[in-house]
Structures are given as C-alpha cells and as structure tokens.
C-alpha cells in the first residue's frame, strides 16, 4: 500500500506516474469522532485534503457523510468518480451503502465503498500484511486478518467491552482511589489526581454520574494513571499491566481466530500506547504466546487506509467487511 500522506502536498502534482494511483478521481474519507479527514486523489497524481468536524455517533450518519461529499464536490466543481468511507460508529456497511448511493449529494459518483474505520485503520497501519491492529484510545477495537478471513475483537463500547481502553483504565483508577479512601485497598498517589477535580471524594460519584460527558471524563484519568505508573506508584502500575494484558488478549484472539501465521505483524495505535509501561507489558504478553510476532510501526494513517480501500482485491480477507455499490 502506498501512503499518500507525505508524498502529495495539498494541490501538488507528481512528475511521474505512480502505479498505485487510482484510475479515476477518488475521494477517500476517514470519518472519526475527532474529525472527518478527506483526501481527493486524481489519476494525474494530484491530491488535496480537507478536514471536517468529527462524526457524532449518536446521530444518523447519512447526512454527516453526504454533506462532506457535497462540500468537496462544490469546492472542486466536479463529483469524484469513487468515494470510500471508513466510518466510526458504523453498524451495517450494507445498510449505509444502500442509503448513500441514491442520495442526491452523490448523484455524480459512480462507485462507493463503505466500511468501519477499524478496517481503514488496519490498512493504514499494516497495508496488505496479515496480522492484527489494536487501536486503543477512549475506546478500543482490534481487527485481525489471516490467510482467508478477518475478525473483529472487542470494540463493544464502554458498558459491554472496550477492555484495556482509556475509559477502562480511568474507571479502574477511580475504583482504586475510592478503595483507598474507604479502607478496602492500598494507598495510591492517584488520590491527589482525583481530588484535583473533586476535592470531596465522597460526593465525586454524584457529580460524575450526572455529567453528560462522563465517558470522556473517566477516560481522562488514563493518562495520569500511566504517568504515575512510570513514577513507581504500585496501584497505577497494576492497573496499566492489567490493561496491557487485556489488549494483548484481544490481539492474540484475533491472530488465533484468523489462523494468522506465527510471524504475523502486530500494530498498536492510539493514545493508550503512548505509555511505555503499557506498551512494554503489552508486547511482552503477546510475545509470551507468539514469540515470532513482529511489532511494526504504522505504515500510514486511517486516511491512507481509506485510499487503499478503493483498490482492495475481491479475494482479500477484508472484503467481507465492506460494502461496495456501483452504477
């Protein structure tokens, strides 16, 4: 897979033909909750990028996606031939594709490809390699690809899943602080962190439960937990090691279910892996069961993965995870 980021600047034209360029104008869309990133790539080798506000997963996706296509079409004066979508919060690629294709804002589009953003993240990180990619931020999702099949592990939300995520770590930190407060658990330096936000710990739970932003608030304690682990706080260290074990379990499950080779590639992305304590423990846990696993740096971004999605061969194991419509 070719990573266009870093090769094409906004509006720049290459002086040689890249064999990986699309045959027709391609609009790649990486629709995440932080922002909707787009890249328009032409057959002549030019590329332009735009950034739009992030996806709101509690609202219908259709209008949020069509608005982006309509705006790019307006700015460029011509509808793209192909549009690829990697979308956070997507529940059914087929249903979304069926709704997108006949929409008036896509009237000039001839082909669309729709998938969950875990797929475009995988393609951006590992390209066409077999292996697993775990993306751990506020939430977490792991995607595995083997010789014939692919699988999704976790990503089931903060109530039913997301083990090892930023929310999971933050929730464990708050639990540890309250255990230290009422005598059920050992003292922890995290207590001072929580008291910076809620000086009176005994009413903290009321403020948190009534907050409309409680998931993000809980997840915000993940970073200080990692920092305190690095400074030697035993409680924080246990939490981070437990998170690493959960993330490793997800990756190992993905590799096992897909019959990935012994030397499969493993990519770990997202803010949680900014912690050396977590990353090191995660890699050790994976290697304990998969000693030949290869930990690789990301080859590209989710937007690069959305570009690659357009050229994915029909027999690729990830083909079962996206919907394609043409006219």
Where are these regions (language model features)?
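ATP-binding/phosphotransfer module of carbohydrate and carboxylate kinases, centering on a glycine-rich
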Residues: 2-76, 125-132, 174-327
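Short glycine-aspartate micro-motif
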Residues: 26-30, 80-84, 113, 122-124, ...
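Short glycine-rich anion-binding loops that position phosphate/pyrophosphate groups of nucleotides
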Residues: 34, 88-90, 138-141
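Short beta-strand-loop/turn "lid" adjacent to the catalytic site in phosphate-handling enzymes
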Residues: 53-56, 70-114, 123-126, 265
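Conserved strand-to-helix beginnings and helix N-cap segments that scaffold or border functional pockets
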Residues: 62, 94-98, 166, 279-280
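Glycine/charged-rich beta-loop-alpha catalytic/anionic-binding loops adjacent to active sites
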Residues: 103-108, 150-157, 285-294
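Active-site nucleophile and cofactor-binding loops and adjacent substrate-binding regions
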Residues: 112-120, 135-136, 163, 294-303
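Glycine-rich phosphate-binding loop of actin/hexokinase-like ATP-binding domains
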Residues: 129-184
């Amino acid at each position: 897979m070719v990573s266009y980021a870093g090769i094409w600047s906004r509006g720049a034209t290459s002086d040689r033909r890249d064999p990986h360029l699309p045959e027709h104008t391609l609009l790649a869309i990486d629709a995440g909750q932080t922002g909707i990133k787009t890249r328009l790539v032409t057959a002549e080798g030019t590329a332009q990028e735009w950034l739009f506000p992030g996806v709101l997963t509690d609202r219908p996706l259709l209008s949020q996606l069509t608005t982006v296509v309509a705006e790019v079409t307006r700015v460029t004066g011509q509808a793209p031939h192909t549009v690829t979508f990697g979308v956070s919060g997507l529940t059914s690629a087929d249903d979304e594709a069926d709704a997108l294709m006949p929409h008036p804002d896509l009237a000039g589009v001839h082909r669309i490809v729709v998938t969950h953003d875990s797929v475009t993240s995988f393609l951006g990180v590992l390209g066409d390699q077999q292996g697993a990619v775990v993306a751990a931020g506020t939430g977490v999702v792991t995607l595995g690809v083997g010789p014939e099949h692919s699988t999704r592990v976790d990503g089931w939300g903060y109530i039913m899943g997301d083990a090892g995520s930023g929310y999971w770590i933050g929730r464990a930190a708050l639990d540890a602080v309250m255990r230290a407060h009422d005598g059920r658990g050992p003292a922890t330096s995290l207590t001072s962190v929580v008291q910076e936000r809620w000086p009176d710990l005994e009413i903290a739970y009321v403020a948190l439960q009534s907050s409309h932003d409680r998931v993000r608030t809980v997840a915000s304690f993940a970073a200080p937990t990692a920092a305190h682990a690095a400074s030697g706080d035993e409680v924080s260290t246990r939490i981070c090691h437990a998170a690493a074990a959960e993330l490793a379990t997800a990756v190992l499950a993905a590799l096992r279910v897909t019959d990935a080779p012994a030397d499969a590639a493993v990519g770990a992305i997202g803010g949680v892996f900014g912690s050396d304590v977590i990353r090191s423990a995660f890699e050790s846990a994976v290697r304990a069961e998969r000693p030949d696993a290869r930990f690789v740096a990301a080859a590209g971004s989710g937007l690069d993965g959305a570009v690659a999605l357009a050229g994915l061969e029909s027999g690729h194991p990830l083909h079962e995870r996206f919907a394609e419509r043409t006219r």
